[in-house]
Amino acid sequence: MFYAVQQSEHTETLVVGLFQKSQLTGKALEIDEMLEGHLTQLLKEGDVSAKPNQVSKVFPPSSAGMKRIYFVGLGREANYSFEQAKERFAHVFQAIHKDRKQETAVLLDTFISEDVPPADAAHALAESCLLASYEVQDYKHKSNEPDKQIEAVYVVTDEDTQEVQAGLRVGQAYGQGTNSARTLVNMPGNMLTATDLASYAEELAAKYDFECEILEKSEMEELGMGGILAVNQGSTEPPKMIVLKYQGKKEWEDVVGLVGKGITFDTGGYSIKTKSGIVGMKSDMGGAAAVLGAMETIGELRPEQNVLCVIPSTDNMISGGAMKPDDVIVSLSGKTIEILNTDAEGRLVLADGITYAKQHGASVLVDVATLTGGVVVALGTETTGAMTNDQSFYQQVADAAQECGEAIWQLPITEKDKKRVKSSQMADLSNSPGREGHAIMAGTFLGEFAESTPWVHLDIAGTATANKATCFGPAGATGVMARTLATLAERFTLEEDKNE
């Protein structure tokens, strides 16, 4: 889809970046000369702007050999960064997609700066193209032709084409993984059960040569996975514990464990959600989608790392056999849990998922979950809540998130918080000791299962979906944290290795 070339005959549509400068230079100047000074005139008259994210379409004379040029404003070069490059590309590719253009050429060198070298510019181009042109897969009865997609982008550059192609490959892998996560989250709950999610994981494993294990209900019963089994009690759909292993090293050591909450639909159980609160609960497997999206990116890029993916998956339904408030269950870890809120089910399945990941070699753990409404109240819909038991490992996760442009904010875990989750008179832990600090209580609960293993909890309840379209795509699922997890897996270094 993305091709690094030194010149291209595919110039019916061309994309050019414009920095805010006193005069045109480099490739932009060459375009101006080809247009016989027309670009300079358009800039003076304000019909074309170099201001950030401004996209201007110009229809050049036939002598130019192309039908249209998209100029995108990059702002001042001194302020231009990798993240800004992604935003600029997103705006222009969204315009191209809206115009239903299936092929375009991009003058990559007009997007390069001292802080954004060729490979990074190429990465930004490919990732943003895929994110910006993503469309929600709906189920409407249509008689019109299928939507036209961008099929080929010819990236014209005077730089090393192998280096540029490598950057395009990375960006494409990140864009594809994120879009796959989006598609999973957008799917209706009746079309994406735990069984369907397991089948998807098996297909991913076959494509990328991952080791795959799907634990069935009977196996969970033998192992004593009381958390996921309790949540599944009210459902007619069988639960699945989905396990994928990617081994990029000779030995199974220094393993990054990724645990994703896979609740395919959440009614709240007997602590039932309100009419407005229950709509959209198909997205309660956003953590699982993020982990699977990251695994797709990892499969494409093949880093020299070991990654373990664990997804406990079921729906949370109501029936005569469903779990009830006041029930006491025994988790895989052996710790007992008093159920005070059946709508606090995500932490129950994650407890078993975290324990299983530890048992199978995870050196560090990241769990990802649409876990609490409390995190939305605290941080809104742009920032993911984070908690940890290890600041050094948290910093690696935070660095990965910053590199990907995905905002996270750390919430505390105090000794008083730990006492609160242990306040049950009937069991080792309570799954919901109160509404105060609800997001923190949920994370603190999970920390009791991570124990001494370095661990970061990411609560994406506010960030997994967007109510409004952005330059990076339509309203709906965002695929948040898929890129962060993939970047973490690529960059991860065990602390003891750093000290050698």
Swiss-Prot record:
Its cofactor is Mn(2+). HAMAP family: Cytosol_peptidase_M17. Mn(2+) 2 binds at K261, D266, D284, E345. It comes from the Bacteria. Its main location: cytoplasm. Its EC number is 3.4.11.1, 3.4.11.10. This is Probable cytosol aminopeptidase. It comes from Bacillus subtilis (strain 168). Binds 2 manganese ions per subunit. Belongs to the peptidase M17 family. InterPro entries: Leucine_aapep/pepB, Macro_dom-like, Peptidase_M17_C, Peptidase_M17_leu_NH2_pept, Peptidase_M17_N. Disulfide bonds: none annotated. It holds the Pfam family Peptidase_M17_N.
